[in-house]
Curated annotation (Swiss-Prot):
Keyword field contains Cytoplasm: yes
Xref: HAMAP family: EF_Ts (MF_00050)
Primary subcellular site in the record, as a coarse category: cytoplasm
Places the protein is found: Cytoplasm
Disulfide bond entries: none
Keyword Cytoplasm recorded: yes
Described purpose of this protein according to its UniProt entry: Associates with the EF-Tu.GDP complex and induces the exchange of GDP to GTP. It remains bound to the aminoacyl-tRNA.EF-Tu.GTP complex up to the GTP hydrolysis stage on the ribosome.
Gene: tsf
Coiled-coil spans in chain: none
Pfam families assigned: EF-Ts_N, EF_TS
GO molecular function: translation elongation factor activity
Location of the region described as Involved in Mg(2+) ion dislocation from EF-Tu in the Swiss-Prot/TrEMBL record: 79-82
Name of the molecule in the record: Elongation factor Ts
Length: 294
């Protein structure tokens, strides 16, 4: 029987299990929905799936480098309490090592790959869920390759609450690359330079600034000059090379990098849980919740 995307979607909604697990369950049971649910329960995946409705918005980021390849990843847990757990941190390192070795192109591909212990990545995560007692998800990752004349910079803030990976060309100085990564963690730029900012975003900002100036009662003949001046501030907020360097605000990041014979090729900045809903538990409740699981 052909397994359709709709069948996989239905099984995911019923069990909360991952896409690859649902597809395999349906394949093994010839598309029988109830048997597929039982198959997931038998494999211990349903136990993990019961936790799928919880919000996993804590966790940690990690950057690992192996020669000319680097990976940055984010793994989520439900509580900060578990994110500091040694077993959780070991899991994150194991996932990073696997990603570096096998270089999957997508999250779905990664979760379906077989690890050195014979389990798929998703099964390995499920085993950690059963052991630790919280929903855990590999949320995202990015693999970056460098040339011989390039250098990686890695920086983790607050034990991995924020992770940054930079790639610089023309400099073998890792300290420069790390300094830039630290700056990115602090100031959160969106782009390397202004030529990367989409024209649509510039036009939208320009129109907002124009209306602001008109609403302030400024004469139309000076509004355009005001808009251009304020656009420079907009670029400083979102473009790495336009920003004042955090370790020496007297120079721009562009000047700092160029003075060290380098250029910034790209960067990736992950912050745990960004863009996700978070539960509003206080720390006392978090401790109590953890104690109830023991």
């Amino acid at each position: 029987m052909a397994i359709t995307a709709q069948m996989v979607k239905e099984l995911r909604e019923k069990t909360g299990a991952g896409m690859m697990d649902c597809k395999k369950a349906l394949t093994e049971t010839n598309g029988d929905m109830e048997k597929a649910i039982d198959w997931l329960r038998e494999k211990g995946i349903a136990k993990a799936a019961k936790k799928a409705d919880r919000i996993a918005a804590e966790g940690m980021t990690l950057v690992e480098v192996d020669g000319n390849t680097a990976v940055i990843l984010e793994v989520n847990s439900e509580t900060d309490f578990v994110a500091k757990n040694e077993a959780f941190q070991t899991l994150v390192k194991e996932l990073a090592a696997h990603l570096l070795k096998h270089k999957p192109a997508t999250l779905e591909e990664a979760l379906g790959q077989t690890m050195d212990n014979g389990a798929t990545v998703q099964e390995h995560i499920n085993a950690a869920i059963a052991k630790i007692g919280e929903k855990i998800t590999l949320r995202r990752f990015e693999i970056v390759e460098k040339g011989e004349n390039d250098v990686f910079g890695a920086y983790l803030h607050m034990g991995g609450r924020i992770g940054v990976l930079t790639l610089l060309a023309g400099s073998a100085n890792q300290e420069v690359a790390k300094d830039v990564a630290m700056h990115i963690a602090a100031l959160h730029p969106k782009y390397v330079s202004r030529d990367q900012v989409p024209q649509e975003e510039i036009n939208r900002e320009r129109e907002v600034l124009k209306q602001q100036a008109l609403n302030e009662g400024k004469p139309e003949h000076i509004v355009e000059k005001m808009v251009e001046g304020r656009l420079n501030k907009f670029y400083e907020d979102i473009c790495l090379l336009e920003q004042a360097f955090v370790k020496n605000p007297d120079v721009k990041v562009r000047q700092y990098v160029e003075s060290n014979g380098a250029t910034v090729k790209t960067f990736i900045r992950y912050e745990v849980g960004e863009g996700m809903e978070k539960r509003q538990d206080n720390f006392a409740e978090e401790v109590m919740n953890q104690m109830r699981k023991q």
